[in-house]
Amino acid sequence: MPKVSVRKSIVIDAPLEKVYEFVRNFKEWPAWSPWLITDPECKVSYADDGGQYTWEGDVVVAGEMSILSEEKPNEIVYQLTFLKPFKSQAGVAMNFALKGGGIEVAWSMDSKLPFFLFFMRPMMTAIIGMDYERGLRMLKELLETGSAGSKLEFPGEEAMPAQDYVGLRSAASIAEMGEAMEYDMKKLHDWVAANEVELAGTPFTIYHQWNPTKATTEYTLGFPLGKPLDSLPDGFVAGERPACRAFPIKHTGSYCHLGNAWSSGINRARNKVFRQSKTIAPFEIYENSSA
């Protein structure tokens, strides 16, 4: 059977014992779990001895996590069982070690896919890896500041009007996307300010391509226009974001946690909470700042 192995890590500025005990306590997981944050209505229950928790929801479906063994304060070994959409198991571990004045938390998983899903191995490895990275970032912020720094709201479907825009189309690795976006934002802002361009709202980004396996994306950062422009400098693009029915997901928090909103949307589309358009690219709107 095709094997799937994932390992991601992060360094947290907190005492080793505090980090270990926090992670070991399943009742703390809803605050930093990369899956539970996407499904606020998910039902979670805990074993009396603290060694297991179970969940069931419309988005994250159903499963359970049990502690198999632990070596305090350096390692916790779990068994992860998915009950739906089909039953499967995975071995999971959390390892804790001193590193550079902080604590390195390494989150790993080893599992096997059914043979008929062998072609999904690269995709599953990439997606689970990104999930682990999202969770570790929230865990770090939670332990260092007291808040995970990410909140999701689901206001329901709404009509989005068509919008003219001026923008920059770019390609970047997901790891370098923050820097690329910051560069594009400054370039657009400086040009708009220098030319006294009339804007009609806050910036947004349209995602034309997103490749989890290669960890790359192609996007257009756009500034909404009050009226179309007659001419543009080299490298700039103009277009119209088409009118559509949208399923908005509101994220409040740092840009580094925005993947929580995207994961929530992808999972809802997969579970038929809404029907995703095949012709209109998904987009994100920055209501205040993209920082």
Task: Please report, for each region that a protein language model flagged, where it lies by residue.
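Short, surface-exposed charged micro-motifs
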Residues: 9, 64-66, 93-95
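A solvent-exposed interaction/effector surface
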Residues: 60, 79-81, 86-291
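Glycine-rich portal/gate segments that line the openings of hydrophobic small-molecule binding cavities
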Residues: 13, 24-32, 38-86, 99, ...
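Hydrophobic ligand-binding cavity/cleft-lining segments
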Residues: 1-46, 158-161, 180-187
